[in-house]
Amino acid sequence: MKNFIFVSPHFPVNYRNFCIKLHENGVNVLGIGDAPYDSLDYMVQGALTEYYRVNNMENYDEMYRAVAFFCFKYGKIDGLESNNEYWLEQDARLRLDFNIPGLKPETLTPIKSKSGMKKFYAQAGVPSARYHLVTDLAQSLAFIEKVGYPVIAKPNNGVGAVDTFKINSDEELRAFHDQDFGGVQFIMEEFVPGEIFSYDAIIGSNGQPLLETGNNTPRSIMEIVNNQESCFFYIEKQIKDDLREAGRRCVDAFGIRSRFIHFEFFRLLEDHAYLGKKGTIVSLEANLRPSGGFTPDMINYANSTDVYKDWADMITFDRLCSKGSAEKFYCVSVGLRDSRHYVH
């Protein structure tokens, strides 16, 4: 590994650590971003061999020119990554156009859509909720006749709980269909009565897990967003064997290589006629990037490690170079809302 392009090295702010650790491994880290160089944190500046500023990172022509410049000046580019959901598709397109190793559009496209994920979950032997792609009211009613209320409707290609609806009645269903979503394709799924757990891992070039951990979100992100509730989740001290096994099978089915991933699952809170017995692991969503926000830092505290270095070691050496500590802990995040008055 010699030359590596990191897209948006300045944002999110903690992602500078990926660049710093790559630099410490002797890699030429080449940054592309929309912030002026002088505004970059001094630690980011110190980690970058060179920085190419574009006016608009969504302008593919500008991004293409930036990568072309680095190719001309430094030669073969060995890797390109943002580790950011928003840029995944653009990253893949740039890799294809410049023959850079890593995830390409033909592999990413079916994985990015909620409906496309279902095929891979089936290959992995992990159950998933029944679904249909929303067209008109009659088709939705026919689907609900089969699975019953409530159902969940959300964009087929989306992230988090943006535009996610829990529909409990025909009246709410009609109200949903009356909305204009600007041509966005929605997927409708049966409601899964489960608690959300994640399988977070750094995966090597042969699909081998180099680091495995996970979190528990007792209150779903959908409920937090739609009901304006407080957010809390925690990193598990030790993930359960069945979750680990489901995560590994999904890594194999999705063909994940050389990535930091965040796979979400339900654990059923009650028996379900279609999905299985109470406690069964059910698939929710596959994210081909680290868990959002400062979760990587939480993983560090919980696992006595440095996932930024672990990722950089995977990229550079295809292994973890530091053994870390055997000590494991829980790490809890609690988010409070400005609009609420908290007494205790």
Locate each region found by the language model.
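ATP-binding N-terminal substructure of ATP-dependent carboxylate-amine bond-forming enzymes
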Residues: M1-E106, A138, L320
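Glycine-rich active-site loop/lid that clamps phosphate-bearing ligands
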Residues: R337-H344
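ATP-dependent carboxylate/phosphate-activation module, predominantly the ATP-grasp catalytic core
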Residues: E190-I256, F260-H262, R267, D271, ...
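Tryptophan-centric aromatic hotspots in well-structured domains and transmembrane helices
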Residues: F11, Y15, W87, F165, ...
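Short acidic active-site motifs
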Residues: E62, Q139-F143, E172
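CheY-like receiver
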Residues: A66-F70, A142-F143, F176-Q179
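A conserved helix-loop-beta module that forms one wall/lid of the active-site cleft
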Residues: L96-T164
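Conserved ATP-binding module of the ATP-grasp superfamily
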Residues: P127-R130, K146, P150-A153, V162-S198, ...
